[in-house]
Every structure is written in structure tokens, then in C-alpha cells.
Amino acid sequence: MVRKGSNRTKTSEVGDEINPYGLNEVDDFASKREKVLLGQSTFGDSNKDDDHSLLEDEDEEEVLAMDEDDESIDEREDEEEEEEEELDGAAAYKKIFGRNLETDQLPEEDEENGMLDNENAWGSTKGEYYGADDLDDDEAAKEIEKEALRQQKKHLEELNMNDYLDEEEEEEWVKSAKEFDMGEFKNSTKQADTKTSITDILNMDDEARDNYLRTMFPEFAPLSKEFTELAPKFDELKKSEENEFNKLKLIALGSYLGTISCYYSILLHELHNNEDFTSMKGHPVMEKILTTKEIWRQASELPSSFDVNEGDGSESEETANIEAFNEKKLNELQNSEDSDAEDGGKQKQEIDEEERESDEEEEEEDVDIDDFEEYVAQSRLHSKPKTSSMPEADDFIESEIADVDAQDKKARRRTLRFYTSKIDQQENKKTDRFKGDDDIPYKERLFERQQRLLDEARKRGMHDNNGADLDDKDYGSEDEAVSRSINTQGENDYYQQVQRGKQDKKISRKEAHKNAVIAAREGKLAELAENVSGDGKRAINYQILKNKGLTPKRNKDNRNSRVKKRKKYQKAQKKLKSVRAVYSGGQSGVYEGEKTGIKKGLTRSVKFKN
């Protein structure tokens, strides 16, 4: 050990002699720092603790001395050779990953259960993941390859059957599952296992064919029975008298029979071309059969004869009957009120309106019947479901309730009650139309006025004992004429005054609005606002007319800071050319002189600041 220390001192002296230029301050500091570090190391401690250091001569130097580093390298090589001779799973793991394998297993267990069953096999440091491919030894590489194959084999053993599934295989399995279900169904219904084609069905005897159709297509028998029963009915309706009801029945029955014939054609087509065809339950034609059957049921309940004859003659008869009825009504009213000319004229207007309403009602009834016929014709078309623009899934129950309500409305439209209710609504509107405005007071009827006058006279006679004596005569037509002449004049004046006031108010408002618009165009709205109208109201001003609000005009650039800065930069770029020369792309063509002219007093150079 002393020799080693002396060797170091000798080499440092030799290093000083080799350096001919001497040391500067930086090299001197670095050399002192190295000496301090060597003194604090384990080599320095071992030199101090060794007793033989005093006995050995410092000048003695070993020939071909071996450093401690070389010895450690040789020892490592020997250890690696020993490990190569006996390299088990744990040793290979340590060599690959740089740490011992932590297992609780006994050494007698198989080597295959040593690594993959350990959850802590992977380390958490960088050295355990990098540099594993840089192997110098072939034996270690073989061990690693062997371990990788073993892990791969174990991984394949742990794979489940679902991991190997492919889409095509899954489809085949679904198909086989369907075939199995069909086999079970046939076994439960005691059918043959062989597939039946159209030729097999045709070759069957009547009983076997009926059993097959009754089992596979249970709707076939009742539909064929209805078709045979209703076909003669269709011919009868064709030959019967032409009116609206028979026409509706013919259209409804034709659509129903046509849908049944479509069912037969689709059934034959599927039996010819589709091997997997087993049922017609999910086909859209079944829904159409139910719809057309319901329409035919409702149409069959209509009466066979139409009471009102069609054509121009029937319409003239109707109008003649209505006019005769209205003339009777008019004569009765004129006899009851001979003197009241205005009331008679107004009642004439009401009667004319009733005539018009009755005509309109008849037209609406015709339109309603046409609409129903149109609906029956449209029901034969294939109705595509409407796709909503915002298909949004709703998690609430209210949407389902709304769908149910919509379906109820659609079902109501298919019935004749819907159209009769529409007619009733028109009748109610007509009665509401005769009521008039609530603001205008009603004229008192003659009978009500007489009763009111009698009650007032009776009350006056009861309270006023000193009143005039009444004669024994009954209340006659002269008293009626006197009371009517007294009351009608004041009532008519008040009635007309209220009506005139409302009309004048509407006219004045329209004129004020027109004047305000004209004044706004000419810019004289302030002058118009100063003038007060006859009802004490001023005209509208500019703020009310334009309705721009209270907020002032604001710049739109303040809403977007990026746009604001961009416009500010563009404005500064325009001003920059007036301050200093800006390069704008160089000379475009041949030199044509200074385009702006040479100005003697203009200086565009930039002055540098210190």
C-alpha cells in the first residue's frame, strides 16, 4: 500500500516536470482540489491506518504495478464467468433488470412460475428499462430470448376465447343461433326439419298446406276470407248510385283490398327469393292493412243514401227554402216593430248574415267531406317517418306524454267525429259574431223595455201615495207608442254617440301616426310634438318612433381586442412612411426617376440615439 502511495507522489512529480510552461492560478486550484479529494477518500484512510507505511521505503517502486481498478475489473470478469456457468431464472432476471427477484416461492418450484406471477417484477428506476438491448454476451441473449418465448407461451395460454373472435365468425355464430332457434321452434310445433320452398308448398296436399300456412303465417287465412267476402261488395258499390257516401265507401274498400293483394304479392316474392323468410309479422304492409281496415270500418258505417241531391238544382232549392224561411222571420219581426226602422234594417242585416253563414256552413261541410276523401286516398301512400332536425334523446317522461298526445290527435283526425266537431265550432263562431262588441251597450228589446216600465210604474205607485189616479184601462198600444217614442230617441243618440266616438278615436290615431312618420322624414318631428292633439295627447317624439334605447353609439372594435390592435397597427403603418423611408419591394422596372420628386428640405434618415 505504501508503494502505491509513493507511486502516486512520483507520478505527480513527473507530471510537474512534463509541463514545461508551469501552472497558472486555475490549474493550481484544480490540482489542490484533487489532492484534498484524494485525502478524504478511502484510499487516504487506508494509507493512514496501515502500520507498514512507516517500514516501507518511499523511494521503492514496484515494476509493472497493478492498480486496484485493474484488480476489480479482473474480479468482475471472474464473477461473470462463474455466473455464466450457472445462470438460473433469478440470476437472469438480476442480470437483465439489475435487481433481485422478490418471490415468496420455494426454490423447489418450477422455474416458469418464478417471474410472471410476481407483481413487483418491473422496477421503478430508469436503469431497469434502458440499456437492456446492449448485451455483450451471447449466452445472456439466449437466456433472454428463452425467457421471452416462455412469457409469450404463458400469455397465449391465458388468452380467452373471446379474444380470438372476429366479426365474420360472430356473424356466423349469430346465424347458427338463429337456425338453432328455428329448429327448436319447429320441434315445438312438430314441423319437419327440412326447409320448405315454394315448390314444396305447391306440391303439398290441401291439409298439409293449410297447416303450414296456419303455423307460419297465421294472418293468411283471415285475410283471404275477408278478401273473398269483400270482393263482391266492391262490385256492388261500383254499380250503385253515385253519391258522396258511396264514393267514400268505394275508395276505402278499394284501398283495403289493394293492401291485401299487396300482402299476397310480397308473400309470394319472399317465398321465391328469400331462403330465410319465415314470417310477415315485422313487415310494414301489416300496419297498412290495419290502417285501411279501420278506414273501411268507419266508411261502412256511413248511410247508403244522401238526403240532399247534388248539382245546381239542389243548391237552388236549398237557397229557396232558406230565403222563404228568412222572409217569414222578417215579416214577424216587422209586425212586432213597425215604427223602429233602424232596428228593422239591422235585423235585415243579421238575417242576411245568417243566410251567408248557412251557405258557408254548407260549403264547409262539402270541404270536410272532400278532406276525408283526400285522407282516404293519401292513406294508401307509404308514409315515411319524419326525421327531426335536433334528434336529441330526452330523459324526461313529458316527451313521451307529448308523443302519446300527438298520436291521439292523429287518431282523432281519422274519424268522422273530427269533422262534425269542426262544423259545431263554426256554429259557435257564428253565434259569437252576433254578440257584438262588449264596449257598445245593447239596445233594449221591446218586451224587456215594457216589463221595465211596468215595474217602475208599480214601484212609483207603491211609494207615492199622492200620485195621480190611474184609470181602469189596460196598457194598450198608445202607451206603447208613447213609451217607445220617449225612450228610443235618447237611446239611439247615446248608442250612436258611443259608436261615433270609437270611430273618431281610431281615425285620429291613424292620422296622428301618418303625420308623425311624415314629420320624421322631413325632420320636423320636434315641431309636431309641440302641437297637442284634440284629445289632449302629444305626438310621439323621435326616441319613441325610432326606439333605439338609452345606450349611446359604441365602437364595435372595443368588443374584440385582437381586431382593435390590428386596426391600430394598420393605422400606424400608414403614418410610418411620412416619418422615415420604408422599403416597399424595390425597383419594379427601369429607373424612371424619383416619383415623388427630390425635396431639398426633407430629411428621412433616422437619427441614432446614444
Swiss-Prot record:
Compartments in which it is found: Nucleus, Nucleolus
The answer to whether keyword Cell cycle applies is: yes
Question: Compositional bias (Acidic residues) spans?
Answer: 56-88, 105-114, 351-374, 392-405, 469-480
| Bias-annotated ranges (Basic residues) | 561-578
Q: Which stretches does UniProt call biased (Basic and acidic residues)?
A: 46-55, 451-463, 501-511
Q: Which residues carry this modification: Phosphoserine?
A: 12, 314, 316, 336, 339, 477
Q: Where would you find the membrane-spanning parts of this chain?
A: none
Which ranges are annotated Polar residues under compositional bias?
484-500
Supply the alphabetized keyword list. Answer: Cell cycle, Nucleus, Phosphoprotein, Ribonucleoprotein, Ribosome biogenesis, rRNA processing
Q: Could you provide one GO biological process annotation from this protein's UniProt record?
A: maturation of SSU-rRNA
MF terms in GO: identical protein binding
Region called Disordered, residue ranges: 1-23, 40-133, 331-411, 451-511, 548-578
Origin superkingdom: Eukaryota
Which GO terms of the cellular component aspect does the record hold?
nucleolus; nucleoplasm; nucleus; small-subunit processome
InterPro entries recorded for this chain? Sas10/Utp3/C1D, Sas10_C_dom
- Indicate where this protein is primarily found: nucleus
Pfam families cross-referenced by the UniProt entry: Sas10, Sas10_Utp3
Its family?
A: Belongs to the SAS10 family.
Q: Which PANTHER family match?
A: SOMETHING ABOUT SILENCING PROTEIN 10 (PTHR13237:SF8), SOMETHING ABOUT SILENCING PROTEIN 10-RELATED (PTHR13237)
Its job: Primarily required at the G2/M phase. Essential for viability: involved in nucleolar processing of pre-18S ribosomal RNA as part of the ribosomal small subunit (SSU) processome.
Other noteworthy facts? When overexpressed, has a role in the structure of silenced chromatin. Overproduction causes derepression of gene expression at both HML and HMR, as well as at the rDNA locus and at telomeres.
Q: How does it assemble?
A: Interacts with snoRNA U3. Interacts with MPP10. Component of the ribosomal small subunit (SSU) processome composed of at least 40 protein subunits and snoRNA U3.
Q: What name does this protein carry? A: Something about silencing protein 10
Tell me which species this is from. Saccharomyces cerevisiae (strain ATCC 204508 / S288c) (Baker's yeast)
